């Protein structure tokens, strides 16, 4: 049956590939945007920095795919950049998790992005999902990021963390930059 889905980060490399795949599969896909939304395109405004997200009046979501977060591969890792990386993940995830938990009809699942960096920098280790977080900046970010989804899990929403590695696509991310150097 067609599903009613909500996606954050739909303009990123993964979201931009996922949304058309889901819509051509017959699913209704709503997207969270920070700019002025176009409701005819299924867009919903949100602003994690201001704790703004209103899902009232929308049909219940079967699932939510949360991919939003500042691109860690762009720019120098200044203190301000690190703060953006943390806030874009923790504030957005927390807002989304709290909002979903408060809905009268909650989604069955929240798929929330995280990163393989959760485990830290261990080049000669084979990691398992249940292994603890590492002890570096990215590990700390991932731990905070995943913890921010607690309200959704506590409300009975199945919460799954997608510990994503380097995204390889000619449409963006690391591979696009590598391919550009060959041109």
Where are these regions (language model features)?
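Conserved glycine-rich Rossmann-like NAD(P)H-binding loop of the short-chain dehydrogenase/reductase
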Residues: 27-34
């Amino acid at each position: 049956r067609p599903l009613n889905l909500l996606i954050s980060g739909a303009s990123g490399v993964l979201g931009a590939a996922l949304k058309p795949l889901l819509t051509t599969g017959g699913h209704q896909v709503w997207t969270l945007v920070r700019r002025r939304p176009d409701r005819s395109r299924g867009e919903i405004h949100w602003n994690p920095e201001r704790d703004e997200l209103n899902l009232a009046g929308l049909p219940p979501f079967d699932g939510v795919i949360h991919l939003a977060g500042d691109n860690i591969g762009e720019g120098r890792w200044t203190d301000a950049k690190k703060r953006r990386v943390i806030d874009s993940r923790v504030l957005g995830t927390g807002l989304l998790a709290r909002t979903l938990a408060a809905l009268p009809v909650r989604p069955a699942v929240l798929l929330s992005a995280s990163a393989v960096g959760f485990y830290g920098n261990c080049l000669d280790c084979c990691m398992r999902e249940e292994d603890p977080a590492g002890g570096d900046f990215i590990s700390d970010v991932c731990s905070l990021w995943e913890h921010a989804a607690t309200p959704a899990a506590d409300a009975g929403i199945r919460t799954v963390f997608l510990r994503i590695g380097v995204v390889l696509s000619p449409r963006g991310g690391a591979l696009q930059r590598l391919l550009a150097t060959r041109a």
